[in-house]
């Protein structure tokens, strides 16, 4: 079978050329020492071990490091030095020639972006059937990465997009979507032309040229392909060409009895490995499928099911913790790269040092987030971007150094929260205006001024100059010690950023600053930082590294379907049938590769070792996962038991046990009894004494860091301000003209909005402002009608202070009206809740299950049963005015969402008996507050109405150790 049907590259076929010989290394023994021994065959230790004329091809860079270590150990055992061989991964066999003007990644991205933004979409409807919402630089850059990825995939066989069209020339096979590939080829042609205009060549084009015209590296006399079960197809083309000049040895990590399971290049044969049973410990004896070789091995592989990624990581950490010195005794394989962050976190929590040889993407580093925040402020200083920068630890450290003793992190962050929640600023300019109104020397005002200066610096010059100046300003006062791990990492990241900026600056001629930032950040975030391996640390090895792990105990996490075997699903351009046709690595070849790796790492631990395979039931996002299909490779008789084993319920780990609080919290007692309480505070105490304590005594309350619109309190305050202005304005006091009143209220509302939020409003605020206009417009009609009937506002926003139960109760009465003819008085409170509620229903509730904890003083026996006071607002207003207006009525002026329900609703049934009961309740509440009685809590508050719900998962009583409580 040909590796590739295309004649242009003339890729080698199996069997391999005569000068390519296979050799087998026993998989019962560790691979690296065997390889070192094989490579040094014939060396007697008389001189240094000289392998410098040897080229060794290994699957990964980490396996290359393992090989060099093994060679050094072998030479050192005889007290000799070693000259290491040249070690390459398969893709390096046809790397682009340095003498060619190969384009950098920024240059390639920008060339594609230019082509995509200049093209006429009508010419490429097979590729772009729908028009983009905006053909912006961001859109083009995302697509550029997609096309570079497609080029890289085709580059595995040394092809370009136009080469795919050659498949349509033969009658034996029809190329699917030929018009689409023709348009893709035209786009690639324009891309190549764009690079040529700049004196550059695409990296994949250069690699394809190198694969077609290979030259044996100078000084190399022999090539060894070592335990590489999945080489790139184009690398085999290069090796076949090399084989005409020098010998090539293929070292297969398997016994010679498995020779028929591999092709001439040492690749597992799909027809063999897809039928190879894999034994599990505790399973029935393995019955081979028809025609498959017998598998008479006692498995050392144990399978454990875990609920989720954290459970897998905890189990792996527990296995490693069983060794006093795990390095060298236990190996950890990570088949699913998505598990790496949680693995590192859990192992760190357990104080087990780990090392990820693949490194970490810089997108997770503090410098990347600082740069991203600077870029956002430079591009468009929205307040969300300002907040992101303001909360960066490096920026906070800068403010501390810049402002000195005047700076407080708490004041800075809490001030930003107050600014967002109180003023909803849209951008930096409006935030500075509002902060300045609070005080020019406030921490927030000074900090925002520093951000404004950084924004000016960033916009003043080029990307390179602006970024360097901004970072220089931020870190100017910081002393770095490169012996400290954190400082050394920051310095390394800064060097990497400088290199990226230099590349982008050289390539990004004509780009706007914001586009340059986007390009540089995208490239910087994708770069990888590699660290030195800490002494004694456990390596977190990728799946392809596991053949080289020689620890007797190996634990592999994430062996779920889709990860092992690795699967390609839903490729937009290269479906599985096309991949197989052109010789790309397919799902079938990956299945064979991974089946072989699993079998080899199990065989390597027979006779005293152990292999633990950990599977997840769900992903980090909660999506269900299936066990790897490799674990279902067994005979028909065993299949039911195997399914039961792999799909059983996962064992409970420590984190899966039902949550319970480790200890109950002990809140501090009040420093001194409260002397004042707001009218609304009594309502809060009646709802829950303990939550009153949290809010009114400790001053606790939630902060919404994502607040984008007014909450109910903000909306009510806004409407109140407009209505208060109407009541206080001399011209409006006696006005009975509804349009005039409506116009005044709209003006007063607009003035209040500008005062609080500025002239530039976010969209949600604009919508809420329109709702307020509609409600106030209807209120103007009601007000005009009431005035025509003889009612006038006597006083607005009257302050009250009354002594009850040894406490001073304070508040504000929204308005007091008097009738011109009758002299009757009414006390009204504005209500802007979405639904209009009658005063009685707002103050009293029928006794029931949810009121079982109500105090006796809050109860009222009525003809319709026992009622419970839940609010005392209107009764307290009447009590405050009792001497001045003993016959006053009370009620609400409702301004609900349904403007048709707008109107004045009096408490018609209010009586002296109700008032006396309300005052008894007020005396009881104030006495309880004065005595520090804030227990027990109410546990029947709906979670969506409870601002402290997140603190008490099983209720407040189960979470709090209250003083003197049972």
Predicted regions and their residues:
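Polyanion-engaging groove/track-forming segments
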Residues: 1-733, 746-759, 767, 787-791, ...
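RecB-family 4Fe-4S metal-dependent nuclease core
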Residues: 660-966
